[in-house]
Regions:
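Non-catalytic, well-ordered alpha-helical scaffold segments
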Residues: 57-61, 66-73, 111-115, 144-147, ...
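Interdomain motor-coupling "hinge/lid" segment immediately C-terminal to the ATP-binding subdomain
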Residues: 4-126
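C-terminal accessory/connector segments of nucleic-acid motor ATPases
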Residues: 110-121, 126-166
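A generic structural signal for short
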Residues: 50-52, 137-138, 215-216
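Short, solvent-exposed loop/helix junctions and linker helices
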Residues: 22, 111, 140-143, 217, ...
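A cross-kingdom feature that marks ATP-driven nucleic-acid transaction machinery
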Residues: 148, 154-158, 162-278
Length: 278
């Protein structure tokens, strides 16, 4: 019968696409058996009450551990099972290798553009303002020649594209300057591994130094990346804003930047990321 023949045919209206992001901090805490910390954070935020220094330090240690482990389920599962950081790093290196294999398939028709872009993400974020500079790839490189490769990385959710807006208005997309952008890693734990990838292995003390903020690397870019990751997982498109401002007593305008802009209830919410110990 017709009914029998069409049983397994999926009609487009019945198909729903679900975007799968790396585990966020709340999901990570659940995986570790912690059902208290996130609720305490939410309650403190809603009531605008501080948690206290001791509790804050404990939460920040958990958050830093989450940053370096990352939100990839296999890496989180290894952490929960008590694997060493070196073993977790090995898992993340394998994930990066799988990403590179996927990019290589795309690059058969695009002259390795996506692979090169992906490999330069840590170096790009190391820049003073984190803006993506094509000159780090090729001094003659131009945005229009690489736009498809950047879009592929973002659509594959390997990276998160953050676009400059010329005006901080509610309809952010209307003022998007796509040629001026930042490119974050989709998972911050993978960014940490990518930064350390030139080492044959990542030692335990290296990871512990990251967790306790005792490692002399640009922690700012790691913090920016984790905020971008969390905003994206919460359903926000990523935008930032540059503007000129003349401070009191100054003769010349100076350039300033708002790290992220989010829209909530028809209002713009500026987000500034700081990596200090407090």
């Amino acid at each position: 019968s017709i009914r029998k023949n069409v049983t397994n045919i999926l009609i487009p209206s019945e198909e729903y696409r679900i975007k799968m992001y790396p585990m966020d901090f709340e999901e990570y805490l659940w995986a570790t058996g912690d059902n208290v910390t996130f609720e305490a954070m939410q309650s403190a935020f809603q009531h605008r009450k501080p948690l206290g220094d001791a509790i804050h330090r404990k939460i920040m240690q958990k958050f830093r551990t989450y940053m370096v482990v990352g939100g990839m389920p296999q890496a989180v599962n290894a952490f929960v099972e008590g694997k060493t950081f070196a073993q977790i790093d090995f898992i993340k290196r394998n994930i990066l290798s799988l990403y590179e294999e996927d990019l290589a398939k795309y690059d058969t028709e695009n002259r390795e553009k996506a692979s090169v872009i992906f490999k330069t993400i840590p170096e790009q974020l190391e820049n003073k303002n984190s803006h993506f500079r094509f000159s780090l790839i090729d001094k003659n490189a131009r945005y229009q020649n690489y736009v498809d490769a950047v879009s592929f990385i973002a659509e594959a959710m390997i990276g998160n594209e953050c676009i400059n807006v010329t005006k901080p208005e509610v309809a952010l997309e209307l003022f998007a300057d796509r040629s001026n952008f930042k490119l974050y890693m989709g998972d911050t734990g993978l960014l940490v591994t990518q930064i350390m990838r030139n080492r044959e292995d990542t030692e335990e003390d290296l990871y512990k130094a990251l967790i306790f903020d005792n490692l002399g690397i640009n922690q700012g870019m790691i913090m920016e990346n984790i905020v971008a990751q969390m905003l994206k997982a919460a359903g926000h498109d990523l935008y930032f804003h540059e503007y000129q401002y003349l401070p009191d007593g100054a003769i010349k305008e100076q350039k300033y930047e708002i790290d992220f802009l989010a829209v909530k209830k028809k209002k713009i919410c500026p987000i500034e990321v700081k990596s200090s110990g407090r």
